[in-house]
Amino acid sequence: MAQVQYSGTGRRKNAVARVRLVPGTGKITVNKKDVEEYIPHADLREVINQPFGVTETKGAYDVIVNVNGGGYAGQSGAIRHGIARALLQVDPDFRSALKRAGLLTRDARMVERKKPGLKKARKASQFSKR
């Protein structure tokens, strides 16, 4: 018997997450590790669970994630985006709730590039009048 699974791809900053939802108990596995082990910050783990809170499907699906690129914050945002997209495959009626919460929109903010002659993207060396 083939197991039902739903997939979605999420992106944030330089992170890309490939998410699979399988009907289960709510266990989240990121890169073959438990989410508590992989992401040490509790607030970022809450970010990951936001789509389930909005759609009231907490504990209904096991989440298997492959994520690469970026840091903890970018990866958490990418996982959230991927879960939201996968939940659309579960039930297209979730679209309005997820859209209202802003979970389907790809966050387009990226790190601004460093400019020549400056120390960082916008930080210049101290100005001396004389």
Swiss-Prot record:
GO MF annotations in UniProt: RNA binding; structural constituent of ribosome
Protein name in the entry: Small ribosomal subunit protein uS9
Family indicated by similarity: Belongs to the universal ribosomal protein uS9 family.
GO biological process, one term: translation
NCBIfam families named in the record: PRK00132.1 (NF001099)
Cleavable signal peptide: none
HAMAP family assigned to the protein according to its UniProt record, in alphabetical order: Ribosomal_uS9_B (MF_00532_B)
